[in-house]
């Protein structure tokens, strides 16, 4: 009897399979544009109980001058100090009452204000964000109090040697240009920025055509569009509006091969970053450069079995105790970038060897990258990119950043296909184009007396393998 039941069940399953269809249940990004140019983008998950909504603005420290450097970051601090409708206390209380998290950050090319809340409270979150963006009081007393807060933040940043090195790397790579400035700005600017500077930055940069309102998780696209029309329709438009992702007539930054060395023999380690000019977000070489960066990857001597990792550079450095750690990077901006490596070492007498073998591996990419390491790098890159899209806030970050920088959003499947399309020949091509015999920017901090001069390091950028 039991056998007949099992056979009947099997026949039933076979019947079901013959009628099965494949359905793409994955979320997709809906994009609309208001009459004033503000973009609304959503990736809805109807059954989600929480949502992230935020505004991504195509303006950061790059939109400042030498005199106003630090204004965008200062504004980020002032956003939570009260508006015409809400005092600081009322704003904080309203956010707490709905159990939301309100946050903001500034980068060199973007400013972001976002909130994570329950789905039912999305209208309140959008109202709060629109209020702080358009109606912040910018009171003189609050500005004066915030100076001390930002100066303390600057002191904390100065203690993070990686941050210090990368700020110097930008400063030498893009000398005298907006991308070379720090995000917080110099101390003198922090002490001198006035309300008029903040108001002028808002008027110039907080315009509808430079903003993307993003919603992810438990949000409905049409509902968010209506909220955008209600709260953002009065936003002005730039004097010379451009579609998001379109480069302005501003001249592309000039990459300068140069260096900055800050020697401090009291430190037990040397911190060195070296980079060539990279590519912008929309460059056709973006994904090949990302794969090449993934070939080198990251390494730390605390990792177990580090000498057995697939990266040849990891094996060389770990086997010879040349460094404590290294981190490869491919940093992109709208029209340029930095591609390189950041090393930390207490083997101070062998800094020359550390850089020599690193650049030797860079050189090898122009001549003989292997199929195996390229395929491994592609798998690692895909895993890293796709696994980073975990949670509504991470997805909102991805959507906002992509639309602001390129005017569109690549789906995870499209990203996967773009990475898969990278070949060994592509790696050779981009290595020859961006690495071989190119000038580099170098920033070094700490106990760096053993670091050889720029000219000798430069020779390794085109040395033969043998």
From Swiss-Prot:
Catalytic residues as annotated in Swiss-Prot or TrEMBL: 76 (proton acceptor)
Catalysis: reaction(s): Release of N-terminal transit peptides from precursor proteins imported into the mitochondrion, typically with Arg in position P2
Gene Ontology CC: mitochondrial matrix
Bilayer-spanning residue ranges: none
Keyword Transferase: no
UniProt GO molecular function: metal ion binding; metalloendopeptidase activity
Broad EC category: hydrolase
Location of the protein in the cell: Mitochondrion matrix
Cofactor note as given: Binds 1 zinc ion per subunit.
Residues reported to bind Zn(2+): 73, 77, 153
Any single GO BP term: protein processing involved in protein targeting to mitochondrion
EC number assigned by the record: 3.4.24.64
UniProt keywords, alphabetically: Hydrolase, Metal-binding, Metalloprotease, Mitochondrion, Protease, Transit peptide, Zinc
Cofactor(s) the protein requires to work: Zn(2+)
Entries under Gene3D superfamilies matching the protein: Metalloenzyme, LuxS/M16 peptidase-like
UniProt activity-regulation remark: Binding to mppA is required for catalytic activity.
Entry-linked InterPro entries: Metalloenz_LuxS/M16, MPP/UQCRC_Complex, Pept_M16_N, Pept_M16_Zn_BS, Peptidase_M16_C
Its job: Catalytic subunit of the essential mitochondrial processing protease (MPP), which cleaves the mitochondrial sequence off newly imported precursors proteins. Preferentially, cleaves after an arginine at position P2.
Family recorded in the similarity comment: Belongs to the peptidase M16 family.
Oligomer and partners: Heterodimer of mppA (alpha) and mppB (beta) subunits, forming the mitochondrial processing protease (MPP) in which mppA is involved in substrate recognition and binding and mppB is the catalytic subunit.
Name of the protein in question: Mitochondrial-processing peptidase subunit beta
Species: Lentinula edodes (Shiitake mushroom)
Lineage start: Eukaryota, Fungi, Dikarya, Basidiomycota, Agaricomycotina
């Amino acid at each position: 009897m039991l056998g007949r039941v099992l056979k009947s069940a099997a026949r039933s399953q076979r019947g079901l399979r013959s009628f099965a269809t494949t359905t793409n249940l994955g979320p997709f990004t809906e994009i609309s544009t208001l009459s004033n140019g503000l973009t609304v983008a959503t990736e809805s998950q109807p059954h989600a109980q929480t949502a992230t909504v935020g505004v991504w603005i195509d303006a950061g420290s790059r939109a400042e001058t030498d005199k106003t450097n630090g204004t965008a970051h200062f504004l980020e601090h002032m956003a939570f100090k009260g508006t015409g409708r809400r005092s600081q206390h009322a704003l904080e209380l309203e956010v707490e009452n709905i159990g939301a998290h309100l946050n903001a950050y500034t980068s060199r090319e973007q400013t972001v204000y976002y909130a994570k809340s329950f789905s039912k409270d999305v209208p309140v979150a959008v109202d709060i964000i629109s209020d702080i963006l358009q109606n912040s009081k910018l009171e003189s007393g609050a500005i004066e109090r915030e100076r001390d807060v930002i100066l303390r933040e600057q002191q904390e940043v100065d203690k993070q040697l990686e941050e210090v090195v990368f700020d110097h790397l930008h400063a030498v790579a893009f000398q005298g240009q907006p991308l070379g400035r720090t995000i917080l700005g110099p101390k003198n600017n922090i002490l001198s920025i006035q309300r008029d500077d903040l108001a002028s930055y808002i008027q110039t940069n907080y315009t509808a055509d430079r903003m993307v309102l993003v919603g992810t998780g438990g949000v409905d696209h049409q509902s968010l569009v209506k909220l955008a029309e209600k709260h953002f329709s009065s936003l002005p438009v730039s004097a010379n509006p451009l579609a998001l992702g379109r480069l302005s007539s501003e001249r592309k930054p000039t990459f300068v091969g140069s260096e900055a060395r800050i020697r401090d023999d009291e430190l037990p380690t040397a911190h060195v970053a070296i980079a060539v000019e990279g590519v912008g977000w929309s460059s056709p070489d973006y994904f090949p450069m990302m794969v090449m960066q993934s070939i080198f990857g990251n390494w730390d001597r605390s990792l177990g079995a580090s000498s057995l990792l697939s990266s040849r550079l990891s094996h060389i450095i770990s086997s010879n105790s040349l460094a404590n750690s290294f981190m490869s990077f491919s940093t992109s901006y709208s029209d340029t970038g930095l591609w390189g490596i950041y090393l930390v070492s207490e083997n101070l007498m062998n800094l020359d060897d550390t850089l020599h073998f690193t650049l030797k591996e860079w050189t090898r990419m122009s001549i003989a990258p292997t199929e195996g390491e390229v395929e491994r790098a592609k798998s690692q890159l895909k895993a890293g990119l796709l696994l980073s899209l975990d949670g509504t806030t991470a997805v909102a970050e991805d959507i906002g950043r992509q639309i602001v920088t390129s005017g569109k959003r690549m789906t995870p499947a499209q990203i996967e296909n773009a990475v898969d399309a990278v070949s060994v020949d592509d790696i050779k091509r981009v290595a020859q184009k961006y690495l071989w015999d190119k000038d580099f920017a170098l920033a070094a901090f700490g106990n760096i007396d053993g670091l050889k001069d720029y000219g000798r390091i430069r020779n390794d950028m085109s040395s033969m393998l043998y």
